[in-house]
């Protein structure tokens, strides 16, 4: 389609899908429905209508995951813009629009959250075609989801008369149940999907008109950003000075050119484990299970795990198992998992933020055992990848190669280790690990010392800009 540029919004922590989704590995990077992550699925459904590779707006912490997941699809993004701090959707889209026009172009921006499920991709693409025609005429298009129930968790859009792209009469906040029932019965209202399409210049024009403080802060943040490798780091102070506002409040509710295009395509924003059950393939009793699950006489249950889960006589129950946490809850109250996450944070525990397995740009590590003055990790290093040149003040390390080849820098020495060989890194000695081979390197690391936290790392050189 002519000049459509997807803008994929990939911020957010997805705490309502804890323990699978956590701050350092949120839901948009997980394959919750199908084989691809939600970020990957967002690009794949938009690719047939796109004339450009996407611009991704992401959290600094998630930059390598976003780049790698698109790379797995053979896609090099037009840009990856890194937010130093979340400021809601209006600023995020503003910096994306500035980036989209930096070389003199003025594409149609297809703004897509990275964590939605859309079952009927053909219907979605047809709606984008209708929206693009309206955007070509200077309209700012939002996609309205045809409601299937009187949901109170969504905002609503009242549409004007007509078919195709029709004028937005008003945006409505999340209603109470009686009001939502009236909206559903009237046939005049749609759920607000959070997806948009408009010309980049038109969005910036309307933003400057209605929210000049956001426009000015984003201009400074983008102009003062630092570009390195595949990423653009927005200026921290300038971006933080922007008011935090959604595109709905900042622009769409104020502009005279807002139109809505209906979308009936099996949309779901996957805001809870209960909604994930709704979009998952179910058996005859309404059960949806992912992983190694055995159930007897269960109804309307959802289970997700890597180890064996056995369920007997349960109804309307959600069970989610990970390496270091298990969630069990009634489907009607599963949204309260956010309170659980708050309590975990208040207790100073790491499970709200980190998985046991932590992904890094060079690979991953899994903390398989830990005790007083020791920790054992399984480390995987990608072919050709190199860890930082570093040292530790409080711990020594023993490395045992399980498979692959390791090039180890230890002080002034450079060692080449293969399967079943090992080395020792004394406390205070500079060291580096590299995989010079074509296969993944796996090793076991045994740490010992008085303090084993990840912040006991002094980096001297780093391929990934973390020094």
Curated annotation (Swiss-Prot):
Q: What is its EC number?
A: 5.3.1.8, 2.7.7.13
- Which gene produces this protein? xanB
Catalytic reaction equation(s): D-mannose 6-phosphate = D-fructose 6-phosphate; alpha-D-mannose 1-phosphate + GTP + H(+) = GDP-alpha-D-mannose + diphosphate
Organism of origin: Xanthomonas campestris pv. campestris (strain B100)
Which GO molecular function terms does the record list? GTP binding; mannose-1-phosphate guanylyltransferase (GTP) activity; mannose-6-phosphate isomerase activity
Per UniProt, which keywords does this protein have?
Exopolysaccharide synthesis, GTP-binding, Isomerase, Lipopolysaccharide biosynthesis, Multifunctional enzyme, Nucleotide-binding, Nucleotidyltransferase, Transferase
This chain belongs to which protein, by name? Xanthan biosynthesis protein XanB
Functionally, this protein is described as follows: Involved in xanthan production.
Q: An example of a Gene Ontology BP annotation on this entry?
A: lipopolysaccharide biosynthetic process
Family recorded in the similarity comment: Belongs to the mannose-6-phosphate isomerase type 2 family.
């Amino acid at each position: 389609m002519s000049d459509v540029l997807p803008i994929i919004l990939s911020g957010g922590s997805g705490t309502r899908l804890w323990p699978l989704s956590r701050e350092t590995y949120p839901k948009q990077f997980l394959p919750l429905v199908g084989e691809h992550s939600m970020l990957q699925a967002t690009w794949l459904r938009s690719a047939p209508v796109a004339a450009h590779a996407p611009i991704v707006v992401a959290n600094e912490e998630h930059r390598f995951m976003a780049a790698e997941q698109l790379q797995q699809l053979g896609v090099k993004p037009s840009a990856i813009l890194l937010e130093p701090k979340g400021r809601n959707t209006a600023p995020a889209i503003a910096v994306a629009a500035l980036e989209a026009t930096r070389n003199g172009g003025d594409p149609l921006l297809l703004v897509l959250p990275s964590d939605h499920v859309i079952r009927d991709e053909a219907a979605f693409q047809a709606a984008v075609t209708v929206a693009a025609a309206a955007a070509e005429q200077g309209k700012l298009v939002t996609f309205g989801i045809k409601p299937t129930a009187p949901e109170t968790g969504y905002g609503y859009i009242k549409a004007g008369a007509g078919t195709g792209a029709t004028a937005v009469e008003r945006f409505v906040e999340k209603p109470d149940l009686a009001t939502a029932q009236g909206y559903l019965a009237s046939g005049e209202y749609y759920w607000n999907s959070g997806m948009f399409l408009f010309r980049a210049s038109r969005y910036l024009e309307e933003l400057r008109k209605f929210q000049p403080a956001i426009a000015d802060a984003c201009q400074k943040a983008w102009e003062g950003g630092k570009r390195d490798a595949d990423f653009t780091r927005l200026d921290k102070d300038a971006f933080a000075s922007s008011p935090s506002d959604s595109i709905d409040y900042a622009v769409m509710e104020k502009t005279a050119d807002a139109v809505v295009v209906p979308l009936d395509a099996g949309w779901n924003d996957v805001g809870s484990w209960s909604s994930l059950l709704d979009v998952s393939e179910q058996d005859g009793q309404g059960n949806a299970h992912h992983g190694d699950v055995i159930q007897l006489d269960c109804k309307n249950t959802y289970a997700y795990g890597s180890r064996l889960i056995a369920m007997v006589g349960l109804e309307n129950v959600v069970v989610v198992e990970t390496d270091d946490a298990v969630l069990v809850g009634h489907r009607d109250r599963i949204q309260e998992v956010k309170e659980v996450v708050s309590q975990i944070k208040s207790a100073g525990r790491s499970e709200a933020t980190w998985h046991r397995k932590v992904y890094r740009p060079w690979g991953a590590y899994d903390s398989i055992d830990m005790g007083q003055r020791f920790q054992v990790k399984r480390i995987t290093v990608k072919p050709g990848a190199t860890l930082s040149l570093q040292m530790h003040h409080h711990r020594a390390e023993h490395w045992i190669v399980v498979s692959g080849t390791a090039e180890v820098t230890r002080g002034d020495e450079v060692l080449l280790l293969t399967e079943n060989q090992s080395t020792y890194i004394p406390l205070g000695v500079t060291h580096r690990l590299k995989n010079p081979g074509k296969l993944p390197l796996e090793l076991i690391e045994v740490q010992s010392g008085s303090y084993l936290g990840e912040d006991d790392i002094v980096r001297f050189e780093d391929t990934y800009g973390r020094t």
